[in-house]
């Protein structure tokens, strides 16, 4: 980068711009001429004209989380307007809002995505999971899978599917807790969506170990207990003891066993509450793991 300015150290008029640091530097002596320079160019790089044309855009990027993908334009608000002009602008904004969701399909999609936003917020889901749930829902709409089903149930099912696909541990109970429909309805919609969107058991498989840190955090268990629980679960998996079992129930039992073995005892009730399973489930999985893996567990 060259310009009319002169380096105060060496007198050079040749400079280079460092975009990673936002600095203009003297090419000869390295003196920093200017700091915190804002690069107003695009955030992407292109290596040929075709790539540049493909990546160039005006306005904000598309978002699958918005019913119109963010491609519409909003009428702005000017607080300096008074009287009749302000009323006119208010009416225009109102009509624009109506026209953007002018048919039933658009209204339903807008409602579904607002419900998705609410669920994702309550479940503290990362954005990539929310986007995957939106993609699944749009695909379900495209294939006509929503007809006759509750929008809330289908969007909750898509959230659950996205969590499992991306290995972000959230149980069906957790999702049902923040949804407006019950667990059974979400479960039915999930199985229906999974079948018709080719979400195979292999794709949806969640290793029980994925839940260990989540539950252990809530139980206040040490790293030593977590490692022991993971060892138990990995051995159970290798011996085929996890097939067809609820991951939450297995993790609860493994953490219960590990807490006893490492002297950080938690009760069956405590781990059952955290894992959102019954004490009977914890007890049954506990017996299976201890017997089949021949574990030496101190008497609780």
Curated annotation (Swiss-Prot):
Gene that encodes the chain: tfb1
Keywords, in A-Z order: Metal-binding, Repeat, Transcription, Transcription regulation, Zinc, Zinc-finger
Coiled coil: none
Name of protein: Transcription initiation factor IIB 1
Gene Ontology MF terms in the entry: DNA-binding transcription factor activity; TBP-class protein binding; zinc ion binding
Residue ranges covered by zinc fingers (TFIIB-type): 3-34
Superkingdom of origin organism: Archaea
Mapped Sequence repeat ranges: 114-197, 210-291
Protein residues bound to Zn(2+): 7, 10, 26, 29
InterPro entries per the UniProt record, alphabetical: Cyclin-like_dom, Cyclin-like_sf, TFIIB, TFIIB_arc, TFIIB_CS, TFIIB_cyclin, Znf_TFIIB
Family matches, as Pfam families: TFIIB, Zn_Ribbon_TF
Entry's Gene Ontology BP terms: DNA-templated transcription initiation; transcription preinitiation complex assembly
Family: Belongs to the TFIIB family.
């Amino acid at each position: 980068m060259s310009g009319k300015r002169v380096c105060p150290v060496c007198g050079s008029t040749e400079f280079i711009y460092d975009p990673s640091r936002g600095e203009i530097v003297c090419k000869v002596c390295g003196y920093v001429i200017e700091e915190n320079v804002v690069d107003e160019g695009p955030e992407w790089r292109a290596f040929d004209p075709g790539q540049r044309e493909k990546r160039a855009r005006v306005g904000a990027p598309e978002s699958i989380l918005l019913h119109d993908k963010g491609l519409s334009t909003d009428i702005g608000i000017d607080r300096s307007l008074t009287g009749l002009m302000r009323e006119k602008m208010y009416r225009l904004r109102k009509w624009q809002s109506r026209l953007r969701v002018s048919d039933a399909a658009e209204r339903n999609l807008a409602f579904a995505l607002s419900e998705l936003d609410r669920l994702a917020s309550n479940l503290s889901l990362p954005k990539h999971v929310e986007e995957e749930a939106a993609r699944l829902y749009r695909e379900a709409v495209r294939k006509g899978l929503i007809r006759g089903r509750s929008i809330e149930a289908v969007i909750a099912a898509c959230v659950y599917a996205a969590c499992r696909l991306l290995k972000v541990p959230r149980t069906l109970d957790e999702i049902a807790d923040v949804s407006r429909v019950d667990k059974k309805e979400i479960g039915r919609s999930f199985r229906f969506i999974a079948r018709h969107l080719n979400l195979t058991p292999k794709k949806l498989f969640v290793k029980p170990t994925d839940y260990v840190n989540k539950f252990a955090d809530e139980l206040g268990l040490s790293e030593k207990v977590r490692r022991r629980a993971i060892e138990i679960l990995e051995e159970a998996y290798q011996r085929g003891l996890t097939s067809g079992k609820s991951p939450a129930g297995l993790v609860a039992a493994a953490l219960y066993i590990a807490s006893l073995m490492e002297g950080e005892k938690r009760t069956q009730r405590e781990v059952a509450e955290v894992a959102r399973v019954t004490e009977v489930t914890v007890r049954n999985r506990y017996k299976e793991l201890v017997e089949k893996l021949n574990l030496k567990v101190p008497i609780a």
